Amino acid sequence: MLYILIIILLIGLDQLSKIWVLNNLVDVSTIPIINNVFHLTYVENRGAAFGLLQNNQWIFIIVALLATVFGLYYLNTRKVHIFGRLGIILIISGALGNLIDRVRLGFVVDYFDFRIIWEYVFNIADVFVVVGTVFLCIYVLFFESKSR
């Protein structure tokens, strides 16, 4: 059950970063960390990645809840290699972090703005989901059949 504590800590990190953004970036919009390369930029994201499915909050809420339930079920009923376990933990943490925003605020708070390579702004929860997906793919491709 250590994974529950890790999920709670990761969600806490995500929410603390978003509270900081809401308290410090709303009025200034953006703070250049490395000018024209990396900024902290306040964005209210009402859709998914790349601006898809704007204003369809219920879809994201249902998907986040299903991912969480399935992930927790899988962790509790299967022997899972560390890559799979970390992947599931990160995906659940990211999904719930953004879910909290959607329910509490009606949008997701995004703030990482790597202007030099990417036009989209994202947050720590998004990083959790992407890295978790990579770990889950590694698990499925290389370890899943061995852990059965």
Curated annotation (Swiss-Prot):
Which Pfam families is this protein grouped with? Peptidase_A8
- Biological-process GO terms, alphabetical: proteolysis
What topology in the membrane does the UniProt record assign?
Multi-pass membrane protein
Q: Which residues form a coiled coil?
A: none
Enzyme category, top tier: hydrolase
Q: Where is the active site?
A: 110, 126
Q: In which pathway does it act?
A: Protein modification; lipoprotein biosynthesis (signal peptide cleavage)
Q: Name the source's superkingdom.
A: Bacteria
InterPro entries (alphabetical): Peptidase_A8 (IPR001872)
Q: Where are the transmembrane segments?
A: 57-77, 80-100, 124-144
What Gene Ontology cellular component terms go with this record?
Answer: plasma membrane
Q: What is its main location?
A: membrane
Q: Which GO terms describe its molecular function?
A: aspartic-type endopeptidase activity
Which UniProt keywords are given for this protein, alphabetically ordered? Aspartyl protease, Cell membrane, Hydrolase, Membrane, Protease, Transmembrane, Transmembrane helix
EC no. given is: 3.4.23.36
Q: What does this protein do?
A: This protein specifically catalyzes the removal of signal peptides from prolipoproteins.
Report the sequence similarity comment from the record: Belongs to the peptidase A8 family.
Q: This chain belongs to which protein, by name? A: Lipoprotein signal peptidase
Organism per entry: Clostridioides difficile (strain 630)
